[in-house]
């Protein structure tokens, strides 16, 4: 690829170093860096590293737009990625530019990262990387919002027992629990999700939970969400399933023919 083509090419991740920041934010090989703070990025690998380091020195977050399997998503990062890159070819570059032209642009101050936790049957739980004041003011309400019903029941029973023993003991326990829930709410939700058999799958930046789920659905058409406005995806029939259906229909035809002969 000549220098002119390279200057109009995107950076594609060729490999991700172990324990790198890119590994932490769940980037994958063949992901393409499309835009830097909503501006198409053609400046090359060295410029990307320098710009990310400069942003970190200024304690500023960076909004990267990533292309994965021809789908775009945003990601907020704070630091250099730690990847090796190659350049996209002219055909891929043009296709991504056309896709980006149709993308809705959000100011990065409006966005937060959302962690997508997935189990083996594509059931997703989406956790916002931001603090919710309700966790510090009224923990049971926060637990109910995140559908942690068993924990809410346990918390309520313990609170009732404490208040029946001594009001001041209850008050001290409530304050300590509220502070802990507020400061460690993301870690708590991630831990609950891991205990339920889910694992980290994806991180996307979005302005709200609904749009985060839509973005995840685009990247993983099989994704299912509990208590969501999105309907569960229709079951995908594979080629083997098609053959099974055809064989079943053929057997039914043979059975009907045999019955008719009898």
Q: Where are each of the predicted segments found?
A:
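PDZ-domain C-terminal substructure recognizer with occasional recognition of PDZ-binding tails
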Residues: 1-6, 47-93
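PDZ/PDZ-like groove recognition
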Residues: 5-18, 22-23
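Conserved PDZ fold ligand-binding element
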Residues: 22-45, 203-204, 208
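Membrane-cytosol interface at the C-terminal ends of transmembrane alpha helices
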Residues: 131-159, 172-196
